[in-house]
Amino acid sequence: MNYSQKLKRLQERQQPDYKQYSLDKAFSAEDYKSEIEEAQEYVTRAMEELPARSTEISYEEGNRVKQHLKEELPNYGFNPDFEYQGSVPCNTHIKFHSDIDLLVIIDKFETVENAARIRNRYTGDPKEDLTRLRAACIKILKENYTVADIEKNSKSIKISGGSLRRQIDVVPANWYNSENWYNYNLDYYRGIQIFDSKTKERYKNFPFLNIHLIDEKDRQTCGLYRPLVRLAKTLKEDSESNINISSYDIQALLYNMDNSNFFQNVKDTLIYTTDYLYKTVQNPYKYQSLVVPDGTRRIAEKVDINEVKKLFNEFYTLSNELGII
């Protein structure tokens, strides 16, 4: 796929109603752009933040779903907390129609990292209560969004279409009170456990700490980290290879890059990013040591090193096209 085609796809993702690039266009001498000029424009546009209105709509639709659940879940015996997680709160999303994750955090119990802090023991069944919460969410969504598509995955309930302008991923969970949350009294240290309805297991993570650390990384790199993540996600999206790396793991992979490798000069940042990915795939032992920002797992637990190699190939091809390596 050439950069004229990639630019068109990128534009349609960012502003689907705005058609600037056409594959059918007959280029005149004035219109003609060289491949390197198109590659430069591709990088510039890929790193840009999406229009604010796009993000606002994602939250508006998330709040619509949240309000229905908030009003009706008490009828089923639940008064949960609601929070957002994922690439939209991190501001690393690349699609105008980005979906948004809505956490529905049960009020029946909390998991405490340090059992010595438990004062009133919970006598119910966490798995049963979370199963009931999930079932209630599904019922409420079906009743309120009769023409929407509802897809039930093991960890989330995806609702889209109908009157909704965005896909909303409803994620049942419970609070996980870490020792750091108690010691430092900072909300972002409070974690969650996401419920898997198939295995009945609960999986710990710290989405608010992740958002905080992404903010910090971007600040420490003078605002270059988020644009680089957007570029990497865009390269994955437009790749002719099927790159099996989640948005979360792309963030994590680049989070592990040393801050000294980020430069105001985008070309230098691309050079060092390409070099970083090359060294990563050449050193499997080093790759095995890389962890996600919140420290809950190694990247390699979910991402095969060959997928990282595919991402490296995209950066290498782009850097070569730009004539910087």
Over which residues does each language-model region extend?
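Long, contiguous hydrophobic alpha-helical segments, chiefly transmembrane helices and signal peptides
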Residues: G62, Q85-V88, I100-V104, D249-L254
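Amphipathic alpha-helical interaction surfaces
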Residues: E71, N75, I106, D238, ...
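Histidine-centered divalent-metal-coordination microenvironment in nucleic-acid enzymes
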Residues: S87-D107, K158-A173
